[in-house]
């Protein structure tokens, strides 16, 4: 099994393999995007630079601190929890493979090639997966998708026509909450005013209020 994983990774270092395709998906003739069922795409995640994502160690510590009980639970919590479990297990297997390669592959050049590929290409994909699902659990999926779209628009806009700073994910939920509150309060402020002007007596107020409720 370890030899199969080794051949799998080495075969994926071929420059003809598109970066947007998962390695197993390419081998079986399938174009698999792990973000599609969540409303995003690999291309949408690719707008974020590689140094944007924290290290795998930091992301694993965050997932453990926030969602360890749910991740270790035998029950199904959400699709994001399930995806997090799979990503964490996948990274553990990759670390086992890297250790095996370091101990058993005699050719230093081949060993460095495999280890570098795991740390850069595969490591980046794991960092993206972990960040996406942790962020969706923390801020909400719609907020994360809105952020990805906003960042994609910002990064593709020429510097002369865009704000100097990129959008920040943690500020989007505050803006969204304010918008929802304003929308919810506006009808409440407008509806009482005409009733007070039109009803000169308390009896009319009661009758009109009953009619409005019906």
Curated annotation (Swiss-Prot):
Domain of life: Viruses
Outcome when changing residue 126 to L: Frequent mutation in chronic HBV carriers
GO CC term (a single one): host cell nucleus
Region (HBEAG): 25-27
Region: Disordered, residue numbers: 165-214
PTM comment text: Phosphorylated. Cleaved by host furin.
Region annotation 3 X 8 AA repeats of S-P-R-R-R-R-S-[PQ]: where it falls in the sequence: 186-208
Record-linked Pfam families: Hep_core_N, Hepatitis_core
Site residues by UniProt (Cleavage): 185-186
Start-end of Basic residues biased regions: 178-207
Keyword Signal: yes
GO biological process, one term: viral penetration into host nucleus
Signal peptide limits: 1-19
Keywords: Disulfide bond, Host nucleus, Host-virus interaction, Repeat, Secreted, Signal, Viral immunoevasion
Protein's cellular compartments: Secreted; Host nucleus
Propiece residue ranges: 186-214
GO molecular function term, any single one: structural molecule activity
Keyword Membrane on entry: no
Stretches forming Sequence repeats: 186-192, 193-200, 201-208
Principal localisation: secreted
Reported function: May regulate immune response to the intracellular capsid in acting as a T-cell tolerogen, by having an immunoregulatory effect which prevents destruction of infected cells by cytotoxic T-cells. This immune regulation may predispose to chronicity during perinatal infections and prevent severe liver injury during adult infections.
Subunit structure: Homodimerizes.
Family: Belongs to the orthohepadnavirus precore antigen family.
Name of the protein in its database record: External core antigen
Organism: Hepatitis B virus genotype A2 subtype adw2 (strain Rutter 1979) (HBV-A)
């Amino acid at each position: 099994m370890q030899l199969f994983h080794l051949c799998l990774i080495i075969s994926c270092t071929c420059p003809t393999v598109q970066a947007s395709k998962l390695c197993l998906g390419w081998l079986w003739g399938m174009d698999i995007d792990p973000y599609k069922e969540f409303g995003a795409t690999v291309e949408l995640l690719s707008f974020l630079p590689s140094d944007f994502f924290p290290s795998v160690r930091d992301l694993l510590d965050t997932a453990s601190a926030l969602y360890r009980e749910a991740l270790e639970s035998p029950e199904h919590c959400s699709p994001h929890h399930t995806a997090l479990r799979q990503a964490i297990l996948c990274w553990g297997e990759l670390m086992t493979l890297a250790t095996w390669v370091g101990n058993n592959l005699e050719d230093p050049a081949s060993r460095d090639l495999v280890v570098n590929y795991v740390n850069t290409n595969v490591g980046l994909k794991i960092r993206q997966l972990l960040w996406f699902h942790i962020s969706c659990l923390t801020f909400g999926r719609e907020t994360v998708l809105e952020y990805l779209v906003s960042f994609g628009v910002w990064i593709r806009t020429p510097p002369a026509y865009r704000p100097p700073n990129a959008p920040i994910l943690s500020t989007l939920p505050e803006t969204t909450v304010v918008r929802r509150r304003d929308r919810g309060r506006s009808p409440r402020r407008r509806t009482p005013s005409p009733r007070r002007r039109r009803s000169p007596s308390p009896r009319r107020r009661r009758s009109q209020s009953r009619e409005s409720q019906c």
